[in-house]
Amino acid sequence: MELILSTSPAKLTLDPARQPELTLRFNLSKLTLDPARQPELSLSPRLAELTLDPTCHPEMSLSPGPAELTLDPQHQAKELPVPKLPELILEPVHCRPELMSACADLINDQWPRSRASRLHSLGQSSDAFPLCLMLLSPQPTPGAAPVVVGHARLSRVLDQPHSLLVETVVVARPLRGRGFGRRLMEGLEAFARARGFRRLHLTTHDQLYFYAHLGYQLGEPVQGLAFTNRRLSTTVLRAFSKPPCPQPPCKEPILAAQAVPRSSKGPPLPPPPPLPQSLTASPPPSPEPLPQSPLETCYRDLKGCPIFWMEKDI
């Protein structure tokens, strides 16, 4: 089978006189994309076999002409541009409904969940709380929509009118470790402070030091008011948050002599010998409990995993 390269660099054509079937394999020769010029194709010296490099997977489609193979430009790999921190803005999701779908994808990338359920949850955002905030970068090109690079949810706190509970804090994976999480938290603190709130609460499993660097300290559990008709009492909330009650210590065996029933026949048995001094002495007092390590917590989430409650006055 003969292969001919056409003048267009993005097309691979077959000799019109010979149009046998074109098969794609994944283990012999390789068809790779030039990283400098993506539409250009490079072929290995072997002509009869055409394969894709597993490191780059642009989708390929056959055009109606049976002898033409083209790249679909709509499926080219897209990289998330790195925005500048001063250009980022915070906006409530209910003020930008056209970005709700992109926000749902961002959250589901971290915590997979039904898309319909996620969109429904985001649709509950309102100025009356709970309120979902998006961290947005400016339009990458004129006329394009902003890019959602972060999200956080704010809810009122039961019995604490000047507090908010921060939940579902997430930053796009390619942008983590570059200051976008700090920018998101500082922005929502300013957002809450401007509306009269004075304290923020949150929970974390593995970001204790990140929040500690932002000024958060270990705190007590609180309940966010997501739906007013499903409020839990403070007693029930603390019952779920407190660690299980410690088991009572095992009782020491009674070493004193017990009365032995007398036999109806024969003389009574002699009394037992006295116990050794080492067994009758009282045990030494237990040492004072050690202070709790910063990496330990007595609270558990609904799955039983350790969780840290933190708070900060703003």
Swiss-Prot record:
Top-rank taxon, per record: Eukaryota
Subcellular location: Cytoplasm, Cytosol
Catalytic reactions of this protein: N-terminal L-aspartyl-L-aspartyl-L-aspartyl-[protein] + acetyl-CoA = N-terminal N-acetyl-L-aspartyl-L-aspartyl-L-aspartyl-[protein] + CoA + H(+); N-terminal L-glutamyl-L-glutamyl-L-glutamyl-[protein] + acetyl-CoA = N-terminal N-acetyl-L-glutamyl-L-glutamyl-L-glutamyl-[protein] + CoA + H(+)
All copies of domain N-acetyltransferase, residue ranges: 90-243
Keywords: Acyltransferase, Cytoplasm, Transferase, Tumor suppressor
Species, as recorded: Mus musculus
Keyword Oxidoreductase: no
Main location: cytoplasm
Pfam annotation, one family: Acetyltransf_1
Entry annotated with the keyword Lyase: no
Function: N-alpha-acetyltransferase that specifically mediates the acetylation of the acidic amino terminus of processed forms of beta- and gamma-actin (ACTB and ACTG, respectively). N-terminal acetylation of processed beta- and gamma-actin regulates actin filament depolymerization and elongation. In vivo, preferentially displays N-terminal acetyltransferase activity towards acid N-terminal sequences starting with Asp-Asp-Asp and Glu-Glu-Glu. In vitro, shows high activity towards Met-Asp-Glu-Leu and Met-Asp-Asp-Asp. May act as a tumor suppressor.
Family statement drawn from the similarity comment of this UniProt entry: Belongs to the acetyltransferase family.
Example of a GO cellular component annotation carried by this entry: cytosol
Enzyme Commission number, as recorded: 2.3.1.-
Residues given in the record as substrate binding sites: 113, 118-121
Protein name: N-alpha-acetyltransferase 80
Molecular function, one GO term: protein-N-terminal amino-acid acetyltransferase activity
GO BP terms, alphabetized: actin modification; N-terminal peptidyl-aspartic acid acetylation; N-terminal peptidyl-glutamic acid acetylation; regulation of actin polymerization or depolymerization
Enzyme class: transferase
Extent of Pro residues compositional bias: 267-292
Chain positions covered by the region annotation Disordered: 260-295
Residues that, per the record, bind acetyl-CoA: 169-171, 177-182, 207
